[in-house]
Amino acid sequence: MIIDLQLNQGSAPWSQLRDAGIAAEEAGFGSLWNLDHFSGEMFGADSMLECFTSITAWAAATSSIGLGTLVTNVMNREPGLLANIVSSVQQISGNRFTLGIGAGAAPNTAFSAEQDALAISLLPRMADRHDRLAEVVGTLQSIWSADRDASFVGFPRPHIAPPIVVGVNSFALARRAGALTDGVNTRFNHPDRGALLAAAIEASGHRAGFDASVWSWFVPEYADPTHPFHQELAAEGVTRLIMFERGAPDVDAIASVAQYLN
């Protein structure tokens, strides 16, 4: 099982976040992930560095660790703009990027306050949000395709298309993501965690390299293959554990995970 780290880029000054990313690379984490939020309010922070700006800065500060977003809300950016941004990040990072995407929330809810404040249009029906996610995936793939439409000549295109992973909380989206993308991610305490992942894997046709990942809170011991939680995930077919450090990153704690990774 690959062990990754996710940081909250609203939790600390950039210098501390940069050092945490470097520490994660030195410790042997597979990838470093961040959030796609415009405001730090949800995390009790007074600010939030923008998702792709900070991931690009980590790309410049590191050389080998994978990089990813968990997850990019597909309502936050027009698909063509997202394709351009991701192509740029993939080039700058040396093909280390994975695009994690999510369908987002309904309008006028606690989870949509940022988008409501910025007058970003949202879709009330979950089925429509799932359709939007599938549409975005299709647009990305068409812009990145070797035989893309002539209207996209001159638009940046990654030499290696980044994997696309979908954050899922429902069986409908798990199955759809399994068929359309390169992986899924769900939360560690989802009551249907194992079944969601199994549904996505089945929908993928048990495709080689399909990424079935789970995020949890940052607990260094979870990286230990002998830890009961680690073994529980492995038994469910989890290929990647992404540990999320919600608060200001503790560089020493991050470094301590090296004992389980090397």
Locations of regions flagged by a protein language model:
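Active-site-adjacent structural elements that line small-molecule/cofactor binding pockets in enzymes
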Residues: M1-N262
